[in-house]
Amino acid sequence: MSKVLILKSSILGGYSQSAVLIDHLASHWETQGAAITVRDLGGKDVLPMVDGEIASGLRGGAELSARQQEMLALSDTLVSELKANDTIVIAAPMYNFTIPAQLKNWIDFIARAGVTFTYTETGPKGLVEGKRAVLVTTRGGAHKDGPTDHVVPYLKTVLGFIGITNVEVVYAEALNMGPEAHDKGMSEAKHSIDQLKA
């Protein structure tokens, strides 16, 4: 049975197009027997924003404040959750050409030297290996493969850095470019999702 971690990151609640697609994917994969865990980073599972104190604490050490210890434990939980699943599905709506702050914050919690990646004599090496990632990205305009898409290239870079190089992408484009474009973008994205196996 495939174990799947779904990360939602939209802050739009019931108006979120990425959430519609993610829910479609979850329903599709549940019929295939996947065990799904959902973390709603833009909603009920929002994380504390990583600041200087937290960032310092995530490096570990003997003299951590109570807050740093709590945030380090949270990071350990997020990393364990990441490593415990076979497939990571990331809902990545485009906000001002890039990912939501809530998703970037999750990345800051899990990207830890010696934990999810390490540095070697030949360069960095990811420690989260043997995983698959699926990116579901929604955007109001048409940005795929263009210079204004700072969502997919960035996420592929981060995932590759921690060892996840098997990455598939579902695009829902031009969602704010009129009703027909919206319906076409969502329909094509759902069709792409229907082709994915858990």
From Swiss-Prot:
Its EC number is 1.6.5.-, 1.7.1.17. One of its GO terms (molecular function) is oxidoreductase activity, acting on NAD(P)H as acceptor. Its cofactor is FMN. Keywords: Flavoprotein, FMN, NAD, Oxidoreductase. It catalyses: 2 a quinone + NADH + H(+) = 2 a 1,4-benzosemiquinone + NAD(+); N,N-dimethyl-1,4-phenylenediamine + anthranilate + 2 NAD(+) = 2-(4-dimethylaminophenyl)diazenylbenzoate + 2 NADH + 2 H(+). Binds 1 FMN per subunit. It is an enzyme of class 1 (oxidoreductase). FMN binds at residues 10, 16-18, 94-97, 138-141. InterPro entries: Flavodoxin_fold, Flavoprotein-like_sf, FMN-dep_NADH:Q_OxRdtase_AzoR1, NADH:quinone_OxRdtase_FMN_depd. Gene3D superfamilies: 3.40.50.360. The keyword Nucleotide-binding does not apply. Quinone reductase that provides resistance to thiol-specific stress caused by electrophilic quinones. Also exhibits azoreductase activity. Catalyzes the reductive cleavage of the azo bond in aromatic azo compounds to the corresponding amines. This is FMN-dependent NADH:quinone oxidoreductase. It comes from Shewanella baltica (strain OS223).
